Every structure is written in C-alpha cells, then in structure tokens.
C-alpha cells in the first residue's frame, strides 16, 4: 500500500519578529495588529480511525448466479480487492460436506507481493483444509450433524494433523484458487469448485491485512468466536465478513511538516493554479520527506 502522506504548513507570528519590524519602521502605525504580540503553538493531530485491517468483505453469490448460495462442482466465486506492497490475503470457505471444515490459507495469510512483483496465477498449493475444532467430525458427506457444542471441542488444526480416521480428497482434487492483477493495485481472486469435487463450497469471507496478523484464525488455538464457527459449520459467511469489515479501512499517517513566517502577499510554498516551484514540495507530498522544503 502506498501511504498518502500529508504535509502541514502553517504560519506563526512571534513577538520578536514584530518588535524588529516596529524598530526598523517597516510597519506603519496603522499596520500594527490589534492585541498583544506573542507566540503561538499549533498542534496537528491525526484523528482518523486506526483500523486493524485494510479491506474486507464477503462474496455470497456464485459466478453466473442471481442469488446467494453455495458453489457446486463446476462453479466458482470471484472476489476483487485492493492491496499494496506488504499486504497479505486471508479467506475462508466451508468444505460443505463436513461438520466444521473449511478451506483457506494459513492463519497469517498469503503475501500478495514479492518486493514490487504481485502474486498471480494458480495459488492452490498455498491453500489447506482446516478443522475449526468446534464440532466432532463425522465421515465426509455422511449427512450426520455434530452435536451442538457450547465450547470448541479442540484447537483449530490442519485436517492432516487431526487424524480423525476419515479420508478427504486433496485440496487440488476439489478446488482451484487463482489470483490475477490489473496493474493498479486491484487483484481478482477466483475460488473454483472443480468438476468431480466431493463437496460444495460456501460463500467466502476474506480480508486484506498486514504481515504479522492472523485475522481469521491461529493454528493450534481455539476459534476466536468472531464468526468462523458459523462459516465452518453452516456455510454462513455473513457474521465473519461483517466482523472483518468493521475492523477494515484506509489508514494514513500525517507526515512531518514544515512552517514558514512570511508576509501576507508572499506564497513561499505554493501558488494555487501554478506548477510546483521545484523546491521540495514534491518530495513532501509524495513520500513525506520535508527536508527539501525546509532547506
């Protein structure tokens, strides 16, 4: 993500400067400001909301359909989202033929950039089948519902580590996950339920976040209680996607600023409607470096 950095320019009137002007006669009697000359302190505070994540949502309608519902073999969900360098993607979709299993990347998500190079193509190898640990497992597609549990029955784990005695198709046999990039920070994620898959897929909850965050789950820990249980048990992506959306939004810091004392008729930093002076404002407004203007 390219952070938008804003320079803060303000003017300050000091007692000493006014005295100098009065002593040298540069101010006429009528020009003396009313009130007692003095110093001013200006505080600039960044009051924007400090969101935990960058962007989030839910995709509820399969491609080519008119209503929300699962994607059956041969169908897919497509999601578009924005991301920049340093961002990662996490998502979850229910393995429909189960009590509480879901597909998704590892808890810390998938890195969307390697340096300046966006991740594109088939990323199915980065996806695993996970056991939410909120119900006792039964044989896939058996139709047996797990007993209603008030607490997780175990920690959330990769299904390969659960050893419940049941056999599941490999991820690559059931789904294909791809990423495309349009060159303007827009990615397209496609989650396809393959022909011959042993399970439908639920609507998808997704979130774009920073490195070091585990927004949906942490492997080896119990479910957070933020909506993943609903998704993994019933395919309802609404509670989890709503929760993630509430914590997501654009966050910008405020860059270091510069200030200058000047006459009313002077425009030392910029003139509206004219080109940049070439004296450092470009660096301040683009990367937040005020040294060019200051020097």
Would you name each region that the model predicts?
Residues 97-153:
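C2-type phospholipid-binding modules
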Residues 29-116, 186, 195-295:
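Structured domain cores in non-transmembrane regions
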Residues 10-34:
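Bacterial Sec-dependent N-terminal signal peptides
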